[in-house]
Amino acid sequence: MKRIIFAVSFLFVSFLVKGQASERNFTYVAATGTGIDMNEPSYTPFMVHVLTYYPISKRFSTGIGTGLSFYEVTLIPLFANAKLAITQPRKFTPFVEFGSGYAFAANKNANGGFHLNSSLGVQYALSEKIKLQLSAGYELQKLERLKKSENDYFTAGFAEKLTHHLLSVKVGIVF
C-alpha cells in the first residue's frame, strides 16, 4: 500500500514540476466527476483525474492520465488519452476525448481491471493559458473484488467480477 501511495504521489508531483525551457508544450488537466451506473449492482462513483497532454497539432493532443476512482473499492487508473478539438481553438471550443488503460486496486481484497472512457465536451477560455472544461460521456470500468461468507460451520470466499457502465459528467481546469 505504501508503494502505491508513493507511486501516485510521485505522479501527481511530477505533473506540477515546471521545466527550465521558456516554451511550454504540455497542457495539464485536473478534473473531477461522477456518473450514473447503468448496471446492477449500481454504485455511484466519484472520480478525480489528472492528465497531461502533448500537442501533436493545433487541434489534436495525446497524453497520459491517472487519479483516483471511488467505486466499491478505490481504484487508481493509469491510461493513455487522445483529445481532438472539433473546431479551431477559440473562446468556446468543443472537443471529443478517448482514453484507455488499466485501473489498479488500492485494496488487497480487490483486483483492478480494464478502464475505458470517451466523452464529448466544451472548453471555455478564461485566459490565454487557463480554461474550464465540461464533458459528458461513457466510462467502462472492470474490477474484481473478493467476497467472504462465514457462519458457524464453514467459511467461503469467492471473487466477484464487476463491470460498471457509466454515463459520466466531469468538470475540470486546463492549464
Task: Go through the PLM ranges and name each one.
Residues 34, 42, 49-132, 172-175:
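Gram-negative (and chloroplast) outer-membrane scaffold detector with strong preference
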Residues 28-30, 50-52, 138, 165:
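Polar/charged side chains located within well-ordered beta-strands of beta-rich proteins
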Residues 121-175:
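Predominantly the C-terminal beta-signal and adjacent terminal strand-loop region
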Residues 23-25, 45, 75, 91, ...:
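Short, solvent-exposed coil/turn segments
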Residues 9, 65, 139:
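Flexible loop residues that form catalytic
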Residues 20-36:
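Transmembrane beta-strand segments of Gram-negative outer membrane beta-barrel proteins
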Residues 1-24, 171, 175:
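Bacterial Sec-dependent N-terminal signal peptides
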